[in-house]
């Protein structure tokens, strides 16, 4: 190549690089992938049948473009390298019936009865046109025991009650009447576990007959509430359905902890009544069986419930499941119990629980009934083999184990040959298969002495069954040990591979794309973030600005979801987007690159995009070895629920919030009418006045509407003025100002009153204050007649001057007349004359 041609070639390359760089900046060398991926092979191959290996990835997550290196921290994991495989060789297996008991978390539920009397005092005001309730006060008190006996037997009570307030005993009587015996009636409710009985459900709120007075009305209501209560372990208190908490054990009578003093440390009075009679409402008047009841008296009510024994009322354990067919496997230090119904193993020590029947005597009847029912179901195939044993598992469960032995073919043959003979005694447990075969061989030889051909057939069949069972058990034991060892080795292999590429290892383990990295001896795993699939653009060129350096993977521009910023990265394996662009390599003269995205494969030749091919056109490596295990029965793992949802709901809290709130709201809404009366008047108010007036003048048409609007406006204005004045008085500054004004008015009235009294007592002195200090004239003191004449002359002079002023006022025109005359004269052209200063206004001269 000549220097000129070499220079031309170099210039062409430089120009091409500049063109590629400019195109990259303008995003002209990018293209978008399809946003709706289809499974690989859908375009050229038939769909994969179940059981066949698909050529593409199965997880949809691998089809999404994602970023896996954005998170810094994640969940920590480690590999368990100390796992060992148990040795199940030569273990003794025993069939039997298994009963599993769990801890009883359901609270103790029992019936209680609440007694109380409620005195309601209502203050009613009677006005001229309206009545209003101005106050309401309720006073609940417990019912004395003698009256409780009357209420429990006949559903009757007294209409009065005595209340001691601050040392003063007050008596309240219903309807302000005399004390009588009244009946209790059932009151409807919402829930079935609460029943109320009232003697007076209606509040007495009648106003007085004379306007302007207040009346206090009294209502006395006897109340019985039958409901349930709940008490949780350790049963030192209980809660009723209405939310009342009582700090007394429901079993205090049997535990000798009930206090018989008037008041114990909790402020409660506890009393035990023997042979107390309680009848139902439908059976009132009868004589049922008496019972011992506990009565607790608080400051507001009395509670009672039947006395029960704790050992019979509650049991610390409850039956969870019964397994008629289960297997007990003996290990070195423990027993393992398994059953086909569940995919779990119960582990218990080799030592049974001592004194189980004495500690949990409440379970004796239940255990015997359940075991007898299970034995009856297995009577045709199994017989009991030993006594019942009790074990305590490591998880806190109690196991009741009844060993059972299968009726073998020899016993069946003996029963068929001699139906009247009793079944042979059950053999004791055997430890190995060899001992079972030896014992069976001896029994077979003894049975075969009769020379019967059928006996030989039975023994041959039994021997073949034993050989097959031993061989299958041995094969299964070897398979289980080999499988466990393989899992341990796989665990070690995964651990070593994770040192090379933790992300690939954790992605394979999780089955979905994740990001992983080592943080010391642990692995931090984070979720990948899916990007906006429609914003992903893959660059068509793998060239960089440097001549000898090319990208090993194509550049990608994308956006995150709910973001408008454009980011740049590189396309990683399986559609992962790497946030860096440092995966580069030395440029080669001829090379090809294949990058798989979704169901397509991008082909790059000489670091430039060439074409797109179907991913299924690339052959896959078959690394799977098919193993057909269809003849083996599968085990469906099921979630084991130790406690049902009802038990969890009952154990979560002893408060029945649903019943409490429903009953409270229902009981509150029953008094809605009375509450409305407390907020407003009964007979008449402003709105009712306007409404009645509008009904009266409704027939007047437009005039009536105008009258109603004017009346409504006037009433509203007056109400607003009165309300504003009252609010002004309620304000601190307004109140102080009104107090000062009132005090000033009182002082002014007081001063005017004194002045009036002084004028009435000494009018002359009031006019001439220094009249007493003036010396009498030298001519002598005036006589009384002269003084009277002087006073009379002064009075006449004052009357004459007042008459002249009145006449002058009458003769003087009013302001309106003067204004009218002035306007009339101005309209005629007259002007007022100006008077000289030296002319007298009287003479005009």
UniProtKB/Swiss-Prot annotation:
<feature type="region of interest" description="Involved in fusion and/or binding to host membrane">
    <location>
        <begin position="124"/>
        <end position="130"/>
    </location>
</feature>
<feature type="glycosylation site" description="N-linked (GlcNAc...) asparagine; by host">
    <location>
        <position position="562"/>
    </location>
</feature>
<keyword id="KW-0945">Host-virus interaction</keyword>
<feature type="topological domain" description="Intravirion">
    <location>
        <begin position="754"/>
        <end position="845"/>
    </location>
</feature>
<feature type="disulfide bond">
    <location>
        <begin position="550"/>
        <end position="587"/>
    </location>
</feature>
<dbReference type="GO" id="GO:0046718">
    <property type="term" value="P:symbiont entry into host cell"/>
</dbReference>
<feature type="glycosylation site" description="N-linked (GlcNAc...) asparagine; by host">
    <location>
        <position position="614"/>
    </location>
</feature>
<dbReference type="InterPro" id="IPR035377">
    <property type="entry name" value="Glycoprot_B_PH1"/>
</dbReference>
<dbReference type="GO" id="GO:0044178">
    <property type="term" value="C:host cell Golgi membrane"/>
</dbReference>
<feature type="region of interest" description="Disordered">
    <location>
        <begin position="411"/>
        <end position="451"/>
    </location>
</feature>
<keyword id="KW-1161">Viral attachment to host cell</keyword>
<feature type="glycosylation site" description="N-linked (GlcNAc...) asparagine; by host">
    <location>
        <position position="385"/>
    </location>
</feature>
<feature type="compositionally biased region" description="Low complexity">
    <location>
        <begin position="33"/>
        <end position="49"/>
    </location>
</feature>
<keyword id="KW-1133">Transmembrane helix</keyword>
<keyword id="KW-0812">Transmembrane</keyword>
<keyword id="KW-1040">Host Golgi apparatus</keyword>
<protein>
    <recommendedName>
        <fullName>Envelope glycoprotein B</fullName>
    </recommendedName>
</protein>
<feature type="glycosylation site" description="N-linked (GlcNAc...) asparagine; by host">
    <location>
        <position position="275"/>
    </location>
</feature>
<feature type="glycosylation site" description="N-linked (GlcNAc...) asparagine; by host">
    <location>
        <position position="368"/>
    </location>
</feature>
<keyword id="KW-0261">Viral envelope protein</keyword>
<comment type="similarity">
    <text>Belongs to the herpesviridae glycoprotein B family.</text>
</comment>
<dbReference type="GO" id="GO:0055036">
    <property type="term" value="C:virion membrane"/>
</dbReference>
<feature type="region of interest" description="Involved in fusion and/or binding to host membrane">
    <location>
        <begin position="208"/>
        <end position="216"/>
    </location>
</feature>
<comment type="function">
    <text>Envelope glycoprotein that forms spikes at the surface of the virion envelope. Participates in viral entry through an RGD motif that binds ITGAV-ITGB3. Membrane fusion is mediated by the fusion machinery composed at least of gB and the heterodimer gH/gL. May be involved in the fusion between the virion envelope and the outer nuclear membrane during virion egress.</text>
</comment>
<feature type="region of interest" description="Hydrophobic membrane proximal region">
    <location>
        <begin position="678"/>
        <end position="730"/>
    </location>
</feature>
<dbReference type="InterPro" id="IPR055341">
    <property type="entry name" value="Glycoprotein_B_ecto_C"/>
</dbReference>
<keyword id="KW-1160">Virus entry into host cell</keyword>
<keyword id="KW-1015">Disulfide bond</keyword>
<feature type="glycosylation site" description="N-linked (GlcNAc...) asparagine; by host">
    <location>
        <position position="355"/>
    </location>
</feature>
<dbReference type="Pfam" id="PF17416">
    <property type="entry name" value="Glycoprot_B_PH1"/>
</dbReference>
<comment type="subunit">
    <text>Homotrimer; disulfide-linked. Binds to heparan sulfate proteoglycans. Interacts with gH/gL heterodimer. Interacts with host ITGAV-ITGB3; this interaction mediates viral entry.</text>
</comment>
<feature type="topological domain" description="Virion surface">
    <location>
        <begin position="27"/>
        <end position="732"/>
    </location>
</feature>
<feature type="disulfide bond">
    <location>
        <begin position="85"/>
        <end position="484"/>
    </location>
</feature>
<feature type="compositionally biased region" description="Polar residues">
    <location>
        <begin position="811"/>
        <end position="822"/>
    </location>
</feature>
<dbReference type="GO" id="GO:0044175">
    <property type="term" value="C:host cell endosome membrane"/>
</dbReference>
<dbReference type="GO" id="GO:0019062">
    <property type="term" value="P:virion attachment to host cell"/>
</dbReference>
<keyword id="KW-1043">Host membrane</keyword>
<feature type="glycosylation site" description="N-linked (GlcNAc...) asparagine; by host">
    <location>
        <position position="179"/>
    </location>
</feature>
<feature type="glycosylation site" description="N-linked (GlcNAc...) asparagine; by host">
    <location>
        <position position="599"/>
    </location>
</feature>
<feature type="disulfide bond">
    <location>
        <begin position="157"/>
        <end position="222"/>
    </location>
</feature>
<keyword id="KW-0732">Signal</keyword>
<keyword id="KW-0472">Membrane</keyword>
């Amino acid at each position: 190549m000549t220097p000129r041609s070499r220079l031309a070639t170099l210039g062409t390359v430089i120009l091409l690089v500049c063109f590629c760089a400019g195109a990259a900046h303008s995003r002209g060398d990018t293209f978008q992938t399809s946003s709706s991926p289809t499974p690989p092979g859908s375009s050229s191959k038939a769909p994969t049948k179940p059981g066949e290996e698909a050529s593409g990835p199965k997880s949809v997550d691998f089809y999404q473009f994602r970023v896996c290196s954005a998170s810094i921290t994640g969940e920590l994991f480690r590999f368990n390298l100390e796992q060992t495989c148990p040795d199940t060789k030569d273990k003794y297996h025993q069939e039997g019936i298994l009963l599993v008991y769990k801890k009883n978390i359901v609270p103790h539920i029992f019936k209680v009865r609440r007694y109380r009397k409620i005195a309601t005092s209502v203050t009613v005001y009677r006005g001229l046109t309206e009545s209003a309730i101005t106050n309401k006060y309720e006073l609940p008190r417990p019912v004395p025991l003698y009256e409780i006996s009357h209420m429990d037997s006949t559903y009757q009570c007294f209409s009065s009650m005595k209340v001691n307030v601050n040392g003063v005993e007050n008596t309240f009587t219903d309807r302000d009447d005399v004390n009588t015996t009244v009946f209790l009636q059932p009151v409807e409710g919402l829930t079935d576990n609460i029943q109320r009985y009232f003697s007076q459900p209606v509040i007495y709120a009648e106003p007085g007959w004379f306007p302007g007075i207040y009346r206090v009305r009294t209502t006395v209501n006897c109340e019985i509430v039958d409901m349930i209560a709940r008490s949780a372990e350790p049963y030192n208190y209980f809660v009723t359905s209405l939310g009342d908490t009582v700090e007394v054990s429901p079993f205090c009578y049997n535990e000798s902890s009930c206090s018989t003093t008037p008041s114990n440390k909790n402020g409660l009075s506890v009393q035990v009544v023997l042979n107390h009679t309680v009848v139902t409402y439908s059976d009132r008047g009868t004589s049922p069986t008496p019972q011992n009841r506990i009565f607790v008296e608080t400051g507001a009510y009395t509670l009672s419930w039947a006395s029960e024994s704790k050992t019979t009322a509650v049991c610390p354990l409850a039956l969870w499941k019964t397994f008629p067919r289960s297997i007990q496997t003996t290990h070195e230090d423990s027993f393992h119990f398994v059953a086909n119904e569940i995919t779990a193993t119960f582990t218990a020590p080799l030592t049974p629980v001592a004194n189980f029947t004495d500690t949990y005597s409440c379970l004796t009847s239940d255990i015997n009934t359940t075991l007898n029912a299970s034995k009856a179901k297995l009577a045709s195939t199994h017989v009991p083999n030993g006594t019942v044993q009790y074990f305590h598992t490591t998880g806190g469960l109690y196991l009741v184990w009844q060993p059972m032995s299968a009726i073998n073919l020899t016993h069946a043959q003996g029963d068929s040959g001699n139906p009247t003979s009793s079944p042979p005694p059950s053999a004791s447990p055997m430890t190995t298969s060899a001992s079972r075969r030896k014992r069976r061989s001896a029994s077979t030889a003894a049975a075969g002495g009769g020379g019967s051909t059928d006996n030989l057939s039975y023994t041959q069949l039994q021997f073949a069954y034993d050989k097959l069972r031993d061989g299958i058990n041995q094969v299964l034991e070897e398979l289980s040990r080999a499988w466990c060892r393989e899992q341990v080795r796989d665990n070690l292999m995964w651990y070593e591979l994770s040192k090379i590429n933790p992300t690939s290892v954790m992605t394979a383990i999780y089955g979905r794309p994740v990001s992983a990295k080592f943080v010391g001896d642990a692995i931090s795993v984070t979720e990948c973030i899916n990007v906006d699939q429609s914003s992903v653009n893959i660059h068509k060129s793998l060239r960089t600005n440097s001549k000898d350096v090319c990208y090993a993977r194509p550049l990608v521009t994308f956006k995150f979801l709910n973001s408008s910023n454009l980011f740049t990265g590189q396309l990683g394996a399986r559609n992962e987007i790497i946030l860096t662009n440092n995966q580069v390599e030395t440029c080669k003269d001829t090379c090809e690159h294949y990058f798989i995205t979704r169901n397509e494969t991008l082909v790059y030749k000489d670091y430039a995009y060439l074409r797109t091919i179907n991913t299924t056109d690339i052959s896959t490596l078959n690394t799977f070895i098919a193993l057909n295990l269809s003849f083996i029965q599968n085990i469906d793992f099921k979630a084991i629920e130790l406690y049902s949802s009802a038990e969890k709901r009952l154990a979560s809290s002893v408060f029945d919030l649903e019943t409490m709130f429903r009953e409270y709201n229902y009981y509150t809404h029953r008094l809605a009418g009375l509450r409305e009366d407390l907020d407003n008047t009964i007979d008449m108010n402003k709105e009712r006045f306007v409404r009645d007036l509008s009904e009266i003048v409704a027939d007047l048409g437009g005039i009536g509407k105008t009258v109603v609007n004017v009346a409504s406006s006037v009433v509203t204005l007056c109400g607003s003025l009165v309300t504003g004045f009252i609010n002004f008085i309620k304000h601190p500054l307004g109140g102080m100002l009104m107090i000062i004004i009132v005090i000033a008015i009182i002082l002014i009235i007081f001063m005017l009153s004194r002045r009036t009294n002084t004028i009435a007592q000494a009018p002359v002195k009031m006019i001439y204050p220094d009249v007493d200090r003036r010396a009498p004239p030298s001519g002598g003191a005036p006589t009384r007649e002269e003084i009277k004449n002087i006073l009379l002359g002064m009075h006449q002079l004052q009357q004459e001057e007042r008459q002249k002023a009145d006449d002058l006022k009458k003769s003087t025109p009013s302001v309106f007349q003067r204004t009218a005359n002035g306007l009339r004269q101005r309209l005629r052209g007259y002007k007022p004359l100006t008077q000289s200063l030296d002319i007298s206004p009287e003479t005009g001269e």
